[in-house]
């Protein structure tokens, strides 16, 4: 999809299995919301095809463009779009009375009652919308999207307007609800933790393209390129070159400014190949003594210590490299203190420079 000068979405392709939860994750302007709006029928792509189930709802080559109200999708917007002049019941009932999925009036009350029960607001049907809290408005918006039993649920950053604590609670409630309903879901967010908690699959986007798609575990532990590694969580990067096999356990030796690092990559690497090694701050073990294994163990000096409640964020100078680490909040470190840093080979990823 393009505005004539810049392609907002390029070559994006994905499939959501029935009942699965797929998240489009990326920074602002990466094309994730545009992609969702194309699926919803609120934007028209320049080319390609979109299928919802077995139904073709868009095809550039065949001239098919099913309007949004006929696609059978439920959508929750970032702003919730709750009508202030209506009650909770009237907001949820709207698509059954005025939308493209009208049902006999005799069925409206029961459908709305079930939808409100699903989201825990069965007692608030008569309440005016302006009297709802932010969390309640989010639930009403979700009930309205589910009341006509759509085949696909689309959610565009629905939790971003909530405070941090309520957002965490709503993540779990939303995932539990989706599991109960077994409804296919496409979710858009820039929040990495939100994507990891909610999703069966994550597609990381940048500049209108999907850079990597996989399970939350794959995306976090096995990033394919530096952008995915740094955008999804924090990461340490160190450039190096492959030296060869190191030991009988299949570890690969990589020469880096830290020294020789032994890695357990899932890639076939050649001697002399230029790579970047990547490891997470929580996988950097810090000790105040010099004991430990000789593999991937280096002396360092603490340059910065930040207490954040449940953990300590610290920066440790190892040679010419500044290594980030996250450690238990009860572990005592002082700026300028000498420490030993150890990184397990199994916790080190390898990214080819050509990627």
Question: What are the language-model segments listed below?
Answer:
Residues 72-74, 78, 82-230:
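ABC ATPase nucleotide-binding domains
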